[in-house]
């Protein structure tokens, strides 16, 4: 994902989706 892996988690995190990109 690269850059998207940093943007999507932020957008989806507010949507109730958890990501492990921390």
Swiss-Prot record:
Post-translational modification: Photoregulated by reversible phosphorylation of its threonine residues.
Cofactor binding remark: Binds at least 14 chlorophylls (8 Chl-a and 6 Chl-b) and carotenoids such as lutein and neoxanthin.
GO cellular component: chloroplast thylakoid membrane; photosystem I; photosystem II
Subcellular localization, as worded in the UniProt entry: Plastid, Chloroplast thylakoid membrane
A single GO BP: photosynthesis
Membrane topology: Multi-pass membrane protein
Protein keywords: Chlorophyll, Chloroplast, Chromophore, Magnesium, Membrane, Metal-binding, Phosphoprotein, Photosynthesis, Photosystem I, Photosystem II, Plastid, Thylakoid
Annotated GO MF terms: chlorophyll binding; metal ion binding
Domains (record comment): The N-terminus of the protein extends into the stroma where it is involved with adhesion of granal membranes and post-translational modifications; both are believed to mediate the distribution of excitation energy between photosystems I and II.
Protein's job: The light-harvesting complex (LHC) functions as a light receptor, it captures and delivers excitation energy to photosystems with which it is closely associated. May channel protons produced in the catalytic Mn center of water oxidation into the thylakoid lumen.
Quaternary context: The LHC complex consists of chlorophyll a-b binding proteins.
Family per record: Belongs to the light-harvesting chlorophyll a/b-binding (LHC) protein family.
Protein name in UniProt: Chlorophyll a-b binding protein 3c, chloroplastic
């Amino acid at each position: 994902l690269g850059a998207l892996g940093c943007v999507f988690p932020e957008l989806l995190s507010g949507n109730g989706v958890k990501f492990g990109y921390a």
